[in-house]
Amino acid sequence: MSARVAYLGTSIADWAGELSSRDPLQRRLGAYALGEIGPAATEAASDLAAALQDPIGFVRVWAAAALAGVAPPSGESVTVLIAELGDELAFVRSLAAWHLGRLGPAFRGIEQAILPLRQLAGDEDPSVRVEAALALGMLEGKGAPPPELKSLST
């Protein structure tokens, strides 16, 4: 792996190595950093793909988001993010919705996320409902926040 491209002074190889750390926060940080490097970190795509099987939901979400920015669009990231919309932890569901929205309407396979995001309108956690509504607004090309959020700003 290339030592020339770095994020915060750490090489792609070292960030990819963090994906194997015993500490889930380090694994999440490795995924985040590789995502920040973006397409220049394509050599870490297989490491990120392996991290999609991580036992910790938030690590899978960050790995999927990073893979979407590092590798050519394949739909694999969308599949993982959609699966995480059903995680038992509200912050993982919210984070997955956030990332789905930011992939944008042109991302390959994103149309599969519309129905699951709509189903989150009834989620018991308000942060999940808000992120799902924002993601839908971004993916459906409306630009403005959806009407469901109006009550939160008044």
What feature does the model see in each segment?
Residues 1-8, 25-40, 50, 58-73, ...:
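Structural detector for internal amphipathic alpha-helices that build alpha-solenoid repeat scaffolds
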Residues 6-18, 39-53, 72-86, 107-121, ...:
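Amphipathic alpha-helical scaffolding segments comprising HEAT/armadillo-like alpha-solenoid repeats
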